[in-house]
Protein backbone atom coordinates (compact mmCIF):
# COMPACT_ATOMS: atom_id res chain seq x y z
CA UNK A 1 0.00 0.00 0.00
CA UNK A 2 1.34 3.46 -0.94
CA UNK A 3 2.22 5.77 1.97
CA UNK A 4 1.62 9.52 2.02
CA UNK A 5 2.96 12.21 4.28
CA UNK A 6 0.02 13.30 6.40
CA UNK A 7 1.76 15.46 8.99
CA UNK A 8 5.21 16.82 9.79
CA UNK A 9 6.84 19.13 12.32
CA UNK A 10 10.42 20.38 12.72
CA UNK A 11 12.74 18.86 15.27
CA UNK A 12 14.27 21.47 17.56
CA UNK A 13 18.04 21.44 17.75
CA UNK A 14 19.95 23.57 20.22
CA UNK A 15 23.65 24.42 20.33
CA UNK A 16 25.45 24.75 23.64
CA UNK A 17 28.65 26.59 24.48
CA UNK A 18 30.17 28.67 27.27
CA UNK A 19 29.33 32.35 27.80
CA UNK A 20 32.93 33.30 27.01
CA UNK A 21 33.15 31.19 23.86
CA UNK A 22 33.40 32.28 20.24
CA UNK A 23 29.80 31.13 19.71
CA UNK A 24 28.53 33.50 22.42
CA UNK A 25 30.62 36.34 20.98
CA UNK A 26 29.19 35.60 17.52
CA UNK A 27 25.60 35.76 18.84
CA UNK A 28 26.32 39.08 20.56
CA UNK A 29 27.79 40.48 17.35
CA UNK A 30 24.87 39.16 15.29
CA UNK A 31 22.36 40.76 17.67
CA UNK A 32 24.16 44.11 17.43
CA UNK A 33 24.24 43.90 13.62
CA UNK A 34 20.56 42.94 13.57
CA UNK A 35 19.10 45.74 15.69
CA UNK A 36 21.47 48.73 15.37
CA UNK A 37 21.94 49.10 11.56
CA UNK A 38 18.17 49.35 10.87
CA UNK A 39 18.06 52.28 13.30
CA UNK A 40 20.93 53.98 11.50
CA UNK A 41 19.43 53.33 8.06
CA UNK A 42 16.04 54.72 9.10
CA UNK A 43 17.64 57.77 10.72
CA UNK A 44 20.00 58.55 7.81
CA UNK A 45 17.22 58.23 5.23
CA UNK A 46 15.71 61.48 6.68
CA UNK A 47 12.21 61.90 7.99
CA UNK A 48 12.79 59.46 10.88
CA UNK A 49 11.43 61.93 13.42
CA UNK A 50 8.15 63.42 12.29
CA UNK A 51 8.64 67.16 12.85
CA UNK A 52 5.58 68.36 10.92
CA UNK A 53 2.30 66.78 9.97
CA UNK A 54 -0.98 67.97 8.48
CA UNK A 55 -4.66 67.16 8.41
CA UNK A 56 -7.90 68.61 7.08
CA UNK A 57 -10.48 70.30 9.27
CA UNK A 58 -13.51 72.52 8.87
CA UNK A 59 -12.88 75.44 11.25
CA UNK A 60 -15.55 76.94 13.46
CA UNK A 61 -15.90 80.50 12.19
CA UNK A 62 -18.38 83.14 13.32
CA UNK A 63 -18.72 86.73 12.19
CA UNK A 64 -18.16 89.10 15.13
CA UNK A 65 -20.27 91.94 13.68
CA UNK A 66 -17.31 94.30 13.92
CA UNK A 67 -16.82 96.44 10.82
CA UNK A 68 -14.50 99.26 9.83
CA UNK A 69 -15.18 101.01 6.53
CA UNK A 70 -13.30 103.72 4.65
CA UNK A 71 -14.84 104.85 1.35
CA UNK A 72 -12.42 106.80 -0.86
CA UNK A 73 -14.12 109.64 -2.72
CA UNK A 74 -13.17 111.64 -5.77
CA UNK A 75 -11.01 114.77 -5.27
CA UNK A 76 -14.01 117.04 -5.66
CA UNK A 77 -15.93 115.26 -2.88
CA UNK A 78 -13.63 115.84 0.08
CA UNK A 79 -11.35 112.81 0.44
CA UNK A 80 -13.18 109.97 2.22
CA UNK A 81 -16.10 108.80 4.33
CA UNK A 82 -15.71 106.44 7.28
CA UNK A 83 -17.73 104.40 9.72
CA UNK A 84 -17.22 101.51 12.11
CA UNK A 85 -18.96 99.59 14.85
CA UNK A 86 -16.49 101.18 17.33
CA UNK A 87 -17.96 104.36 18.88
CA UNK A 88 -14.52 105.77 19.70
CA UNK A 89 -13.52 105.56 16.03
CA UNK A 90 -16.74 107.24 14.93
CA UNK A 91 -16.18 110.15 17.33
CA UNK A 92 -12.83 110.81 15.67
CA UNK A 93 -14.31 111.18 12.18
CA UNK A 94 -16.32 114.38 12.61
CA UNK A 95 -18.01 115.41 9.33
CA UNK A 96 -16.54 112.40 7.53
CA UNK A 97 -18.73 109.99 9.50
CA UNK A 98 -21.48 108.41 7.41
CA UNK A 99 -23.65 105.68 8.94
CA UNK A 100 -24.56 102.91 6.48
CA UNK A 101 -27.25 100.24 6.51
CA UNK A 102 -25.67 96.83 7.20
CA UNK A 103 -27.27 93.40 6.90
CA UNK A 104 -25.52 90.07 7.49
CA UNK A 105 -26.45 86.42 7.38
CA UNK A 106 -24.36 83.32 8.05
CA UNK A 107 -25.30 80.04 6.40
CA UNK A 108 -24.69 76.38 7.29
CA UNK A 109 -25.14 74.79 3.88
CA UNK A 110 -24.35 71.16 4.76
CA UNK A 111 -26.12 71.20 8.15
CA UNK A 112 -23.07 70.00 10.09
CA UNK A 113 -23.40 72.57 12.86
CA UNK A 114 -20.62 74.79 11.47
CA UNK A 115 -21.18 77.92 9.42
CA UNK A 116 -19.99 77.71 5.82
CA UNK A 117 -20.34 81.28 4.54
CA UNK A 118 -21.21 84.87 5.35
CA UNK A 119 -23.53 87.05 3.29
CA UNK A 120 -22.61 90.68 3.97
CA UNK A 121 -24.34 93.74 2.53
CA UNK A 122 -23.57 97.38 3.27
CA UNK A 123 -25.44 100.36 1.81
CA UNK A 124 -23.60 103.67 2.22
CA UNK A 125 -25.79 106.75 1.62
CA UNK A 126 -24.19 109.37 -0.62
CA UNK A 127 -24.96 112.88 -1.71
CA UNK A 128 -25.39 113.55 -5.41
CA UNK A 129 -21.95 115.20 -5.54
CA UNK A 130 -20.14 112.31 -3.82
CA UNK A 131 -18.57 109.56 -5.90
CA UNK A 132 -16.83 106.47 -4.51
CA UNK A 133 -13.57 105.47 -6.21
CA UNK A 134 -12.33 102.90 -3.70
CA UNK A 135 -13.12 100.93 -0.58
CA UNK A 136 -11.16 99.72 2.45
CA UNK A 137 -13.11 97.29 4.62
CA UNK A 138 -12.26 95.21 7.70
CA UNK A 139 -14.54 92.45 9.01
CA UNK A 140 -13.61 90.50 12.15
CA UNK A 141 -14.27 86.83 12.95
CA UNK A 142 -13.85 84.32 15.74
CA UNK A 143 -11.85 81.35 14.46
CA UNK A 144 -11.32 78.01 16.22
CA UNK A 145 -9.97 74.53 15.46
CA UNK A 146 -10.83 71.43 17.48
CA UNK A 147 -8.88 68.33 16.38
CA UNK A 148 -5.07 68.04 16.64
CA UNK A 149 -4.26 71.73 17.09
CA UNK A 150 -6.77 73.75 19.11
CA UNK A 151 -6.15 77.47 18.60
CA UNK A 152 -8.90 79.99 19.27
CA UNK A 153 -8.40 83.51 17.94
CA UNK A 154 -9.96 86.72 16.71
CA UNK A 155 -9.13 87.19 13.04
CA UNK A 156 -10.12 89.45 10.19
CA UNK A 157 -10.77 89.76 6.48
CA UNK A 158 -9.34 92.87 4.84
CA UNK A 159 -10.70 94.07 1.52
CA UNK A 160 -9.19 96.90 -0.50
CA UNK A 161 -10.29 97.88 -4.00
CA UNK A 162 -9.93 101.06 -6.02
CA UNK A 163 -10.91 102.00 -9.56
CA UNK A 164 -10.43 105.05 -11.79
CA UNK A 165 -14.16 105.55 -12.38
CA UNK A 166 -16.89 106.11 -9.77
CA UNK A 167 -18.84 103.01 -8.84
CA UNK A 168 -22.32 102.14 -7.70
CA UNK A 169 -21.63 98.72 -6.24
CA UNK A 170 -18.75 96.46 -5.26
CA UNK A 171 -19.37 92.71 -5.43
CA UNK A 172 -16.92 90.36 -3.71
CA UNK A 173 -16.88 86.55 -3.55
CA UNK A 174 -13.92 84.94 -1.78
CA UNK A 175 -12.63 82.50 0.85
CA UNK A 176 -11.51 83.24 4.39
CA UNK A 177 -8.24 81.32 4.36
CA UNK A 178 -5.93 80.40 7.24
CA UNK A 179 -2.29 81.45 6.93
CA UNK A 180 0.45 79.84 9.05
CA UNK A 181 4.01 81.04 9.42
CA UNK A 182 4.89 77.95 11.46
CA UNK A 183 3.15 74.68 12.43
CA UNK A 184 0.59 74.87 15.20
CA UNK A 185 1.27 73.24 18.55
CA UNK A 186 -1.00 70.35 19.55
CA UNK A 187 -0.40 70.75 23.28
CA UNK A 188 -3.69 72.14 24.59
CA UNK A 189 -5.73 75.26 23.92
CA UNK A 190 -3.80 78.13 22.32
CA UNK A 191 -5.51 81.45 23.08
CA UNK A 192 -2.59 83.82 22.39
CA UNK A 193 -4.48 85.61 19.63
CA UNK A 194 -7.92 85.53 21.20
CA UNK A 195 -7.92 89.32 21.42
CA UNK A 196 -9.65 91.90 19.27
CA UNK A 197 -7.89 92.78 16.03
CA UNK A 198 -8.81 96.44 16.57
CA UNK A 199 -8.61 98.10 19.99
CA UNK A 200 -12.13 99.47 19.90
CA UNK A 201 -11.89 101.18 23.30
CA UNK A 202 -8.91 103.36 22.40
CA UNK A 203 -9.57 107.11 21.97
CA UNK A 204 -6.44 107.55 19.83
CA UNK A 205 -6.58 107.74 16.03
CA UNK A 206 -3.31 105.80 15.76
CA UNK A 207 -4.99 102.61 16.98
CA UNK A 208 -7.47 102.76 14.08
CA UNK A 209 -4.94 103.62 11.39
CA UNK A 210 -5.12 100.82 8.82
CA UNK A 211 -1.35 100.75 8.40
CA UNK A 212 -0.93 100.13 12.13
CA UNK A 213 -3.78 97.59 12.31
CA UNK A 214 -2.47 95.54 9.36
CA UNK A 215 1.15 95.68 10.57
CA UNK A 216 0.22 94.46 14.07
CA UNK A 217 -1.99 91.74 12.60
CA UNK A 218 0.79 90.45 10.35
CA UNK A 219 3.07 89.98 13.36
CA UNK A 220 0.97 86.98 14.32
CA UNK A 221 2.08 83.45 13.48
CA UNK A 222 -1.48 82.54 12.49
CA UNK A 223 -3.81 84.84 10.54
CA UNK A 224 -6.71 84.71 8.13
CA UNK A 225 -6.94 86.52 4.80
CA UNK A 226 -9.65 87.07 2.24
CA UNK A 227 -8.38 84.91 -0.62
CA UNK A 228 -9.42 85.37 -4.27
CA UNK A 229 -12.04 88.05 -3.58
CA UNK A 230 -12.59 88.59 -7.34
CA UNK A 231 -13.96 92.14 -6.92
CA UNK A 232 -16.50 93.29 -9.48
CA UNK A 233 -16.89 97.07 -9.74
CA UNK A 234 -20.27 98.18 -11.04
CA UNK A 235 -20.77 101.73 -12.35
CA UNK A 236 -23.79 103.87 -13.10
CA UNK A 237 -25.16 105.03 -9.73
CA UNK A 238 -28.33 107.12 -9.60
CA UNK A 239 -28.06 110.50 -7.86
CA UNK A 240 -29.99 109.44 -4.76
CA UNK A 241 -28.84 105.80 -4.66
CA UNK A 242 -26.42 104.49 -1.99
CA UNK A 243 -23.11 102.85 -2.70
CA UNK A 244 -23.50 99.11 -2.07
CA UNK A 245 -20.99 96.49 -0.98
CA UNK A 246 -22.15 92.92 -1.52
CA UNK A 247 -19.77 90.27 -0.15
CA UNK A 248 -19.93 86.50 0.08
CA UNK A 249 -17.17 85.07 2.27
CA UNK A 250 -16.81 81.30 2.45
CA UNK A 251 -15.30 79.32 5.35
CA UNK A 252 -13.60 76.41 3.52
CA UNK A 253 -12.00 73.23 4.85
CA UNK A 254 -8.36 73.95 5.70
CA UNK A 255 -5.19 71.85 5.57
CA UNK A 256 -3.69 72.43 9.02
CA UNK A 257 0.05 72.05 9.58
CA UNK A 258 0.98 71.12 13.17
CA UNK A 259 3.81 69.81 15.33
CA UNK A 260 3.07 66.18 16.28
CA UNK A 261 3.17 65.07 19.89
CA UNK A 262 5.75 62.71 21.41
CA UNK A 263 3.77 59.48 20.98
CA UNK A 264 2.87 60.29 17.38
CA UNK A 265 6.56 60.85 16.65
CA UNK A 266 7.46 57.54 18.31
CA UNK A 267 4.76 55.69 16.36
CA UNK A 268 5.98 57.13 13.06
CA UNK A 269 9.63 56.29 13.85
CA UNK A 270 8.71 52.79 15.08
CA UNK A 271 6.95 51.91 11.81
CA UNK A 272 10.02 52.91 9.80
CA UNK A 273 12.40 51.05 12.11
CA UNK A 274 10.41 47.80 12.19
CA UNK A 275 9.96 47.71 8.40
CA UNK A 276 13.76 47.72 7.98
CA UNK A 277 14.37 45.52 11.04
CA UNK A 278 12.33 42.63 9.61
CA UNK A 279 14.73 42.36 6.67
CA UNK A 280 17.78 42.28 8.94
CA UNK A 281 16.14 39.70 11.24
CA UNK A 282 15.41 37.40 8.29
CA UNK A 283 18.96 37.71 6.88
CA UNK A 284 20.80 37.17 10.18
CA UNK A 285 18.51 34.28 11.14
CA UNK A 286 19.69 32.48 8.00
CA UNK A 287 23.31 33.39 8.78
CA UNK A 288 23.03 31.99 12.32
CA UNK A 289 21.51 28.75 11.06
CA UNK A 290 24.37 28.34 8.56
CA UNK A 291 27.07 29.11 11.15
CA UNK A 292 25.77 26.69 13.80
CA UNK A 293 24.77 23.87 11.46
CA UNK A 294 28.20 23.88 9.81
CA UNK A 295 30.05 24.34 13.12
CA UNK A 296 31.83 27.50 11.98
CA UNK A 297 32.06 28.21 15.70
CA UNK A 298 32.51 25.28 18.07
CA UNK A 299 29.33 24.23 19.90
CA UNK A 300 27.71 21.04 21.17
CA UNK A 301 24.56 20.23 19.14
CA UNK A 302 21.69 18.82 21.19
CA UNK A 303 18.52 17.48 19.61
CA UNK A 304 15.47 18.09 21.75
CA UNK A 305 13.71 14.87 22.81
CA UNK A 306 9.92 14.86 22.31
CA UNK A 307 7.98 14.93 25.60
CA UNK A 308 6.31 11.58 24.89
CA UNK A 309 9.64 9.81 24.49
CA UNK A 310 10.94 11.38 27.71
CA UNK A 311 7.95 9.95 29.60
CA UNK A 312 8.56 6.49 28.11
CA UNK A 313 12.20 6.55 29.20
CA UNK A 314 11.18 7.37 32.79
CA UNK A 315 8.56 4.60 32.84
CA UNK A 316 11.02 2.02 31.56
UniProtKB/Swiss-Prot annotation:
Coiled-coil region list: none
UniProt main location, coarse: membrane
Glycosylated residues, chain numbering: 194, 199, 221
Keyword terms: Cell membrane, Cell projection, Cilium, Cilium biogenesis/degradation, Glycoprotein, Membrane, Transmembrane, Transmembrane helix
UniProt keyword Transmembrane present: yes
Transmembrane segments annotated in the record for this chain: 23-43, 264-284
Membrane association type: Multi-pass membrane protein
Domain of life (superkingdom): Eukaryota
One Pfam family in the UniProt entry: TM231
Cellular localization per UniProt: Cell projection, Cilium membrane
Keyword Transferase appears in the UniProt entry: no
A single BP term in Gene Ontology: cilium assembly
InterPro entries: TMEM231
Cellular component, GO, one term: ciliary transition zone
Quaternary state and interactors: Part of the tectonic-like complex (also named B9 complex). Interacts with TMEM107.
Function: Transmembrane component of the tectonic-like complex, a complex localized at the transition zone of primary cilia and acting as a barrier that prevents diffusion of transmembrane proteins between the cilia and plasma membranes. Required for ciliogenesis and sonic hedgehog/SHH signaling.
Similarity remark: Belongs to the TMEM231 family.
Protein name (Swiss-Prot/TrEMBL): Transmembrane protein 231
Organism field: Pongo abelii (Sumatran orangutan)
